[in-house]
From Swiss-Prot:
The gene is gfcE. Residues 1-20 form the signal peptide. One of its GO terms (biological process) is monoatomic ion transport. The keyword tRNA processing does not apply. Pfam families: Poly_export, SLBB_2, Wza_C. Its main location: membrane. InterPro entries: Poly_export, Poly_export_N, SLBB_dom, Wza_C. May be involved in polysaccharide transport. This is Putative polysaccharide export protein GfcE. It is a multi-pass membrane protein. NCBIfam families: PRK15078.1 (NF011658).
């Protein structure tokens, strides 16, 4: 009898060891033997911290952003009309006195005007024959021409003078970030606008976030929406660039949404320049899992700004039991860091529980059969 009991115990342990691992699937992290920090808000009711809205045509209209209309920019037009370049340190000037070649530095066949012109020294002055040292930094070309004409009038009868900039080296604006050729761009006698600077930099890259461009002028940052400017014709977004301005085009890495739950492939998706709809996000995640997904429970979880009214998130629910409701998904625009979650159908949850219990039930059945066999085992 003792021999049978021993055999039965061994077989029982073997069967239990094979079935025990099926009782609790996946990894586990126990907190029972660890220090758990108690926080003042440990006890909270999550249900009271969210708002849930069914996705309806009315909600789509309510959430839809106001259309961006084409707008003129009279302020920029006035700035361009009044624009005059002011000479700076490092510029190279070309001074021409008609009928007096001895006063005009010849460029020569193999020498550019920038090599032979009058360089503006660190003190902001140039040297010119019959005049000597002449302060030019901060002045316009018209002011310098008038001053040279007046100074030469005592040695030349009715001098005809022309002054131009042979090389613009003193003042620069900077275009950085997601453009084809980032770097500095000279401020010249031709006004430089945001559009001009981006075109000169080779345009935007595929990863550019053109809705959140930042222009820094005199330490003050201004948001520029290139989408509104380029796609919608809102010319108010175009601004005149000044020396030292920085135009930064960020990457769209932060423009992402998360698709979780019963989809073909749980994913982190990056939004492109045109944005992303709920239908696009589901499509990029290989759609709903038709075997286990609950089509009535397609949720978009969106964090609220500054926990308005004590709410941490707004949740939008799309009931797509009727597939034609997915047309609403094509109109629902996602925002960065939205979470798209597709719930599991109740029957699928039950099937999963059963699938976990079947190995255990089989093990118990095997154990019962083994017990009967042992009881009939000859001594």
């Amino acid at each position: 009898m003792k021999k049978n009991i021993f055999k039965f115990s061994v077989l029982t342990l073997a069967v239990l060891s094979l079935t025990a691992c099926t009782l609790v699937p996946g990894q586990n992290l126990s907190t029972s033997n660890k220090d758990v920090i108690e926080l003042p808000d440990n006890q909270y009711d999550l249900d009271k911290m969210v708002n849930i809205y069914p996705v309806t045509p009315g909600l789509i209209d309510q959430l839809r952003a106001k259309p961006i209309m084409s707008q003129a920019n009279p302020e920029l037009e006035q700035q361009i009309a009044n624009y005059e370049y002011r000479i700076g340190i490092g510029d190279v000037l070309m001074v021409t006195v008609w009928d007096h070649p001895e006063l005009t530095t010849p460029a020569g066949q193999y020498r550019s005007a920038s090599d032979t012109g009058n360089w503006v020294n660190a003190d902001g002055a140039i040297f010119y024959p019959y005049i000597g040292r002449l302060k030019v930094a901060g002045k316009t070309l018209t002011q310098v021409r008038n001053e040279i004409t007046a100074r030469l009038d005592s040695v030349i009868e009715s001098p005809q003078v022309d002054v131009s900039v042979a090389a613009f080296r003193s003042q620069k604006a900077y275009v950085t970030g997601e453009v084809s050729k980032s770097g500095q761009q000279p401020i010249t006698n031709i006004p430089l606008t945001i559009m001009d600077a981006i075109n000169a930099a080779g345009g935007l890259t595929a990863d550019a976030d053109w809705r959140n461009v930042v222009l820094t002028q005199n330490g003050v940052k201004t948001k520029v929406n290139l989408y509104a400017l380029m796609q919608r014709g809102d010319l108010r977004q175009n601004k005149l660039l000044h020396p030292g301005d920085i135009l930064f085009i960020p990457r769209n890495d932060d423009l992402k949404v998360f698709v979780m739950g019963e989809v073909g492939k749980q994913s982190t998706l990056k939004m492109d320049r045109s944005g992303m709809t709920l239908a696009e996000a589901l499509g990029n995640a290989e759609g709903m899992n038709q075997d286990v997904a609950d089509a009535t429970g397609i949720f978009v979880i969106r964090a609220t700004q500054n926990k308005q009214n004590g709410k941490i998130a707004n949740i939008y629910q799309l009931n797509a039991k009727d597939a034609s409701a997915m047309i609403l998904g094509t109109e629902f625009q996602l925002e960065p860091y939205d979470i798209v979650y597709v719930t599991t159908a109740p029957l699928a949850r039950w099937n999963r529980v059963i699938s976990l219990l079947v190995p255990t039930i089989s093990g118990v059945h095997d154990l019962t059969e083994t017990s009967r066999w042992i009881q009939t085992w000859p001594n």
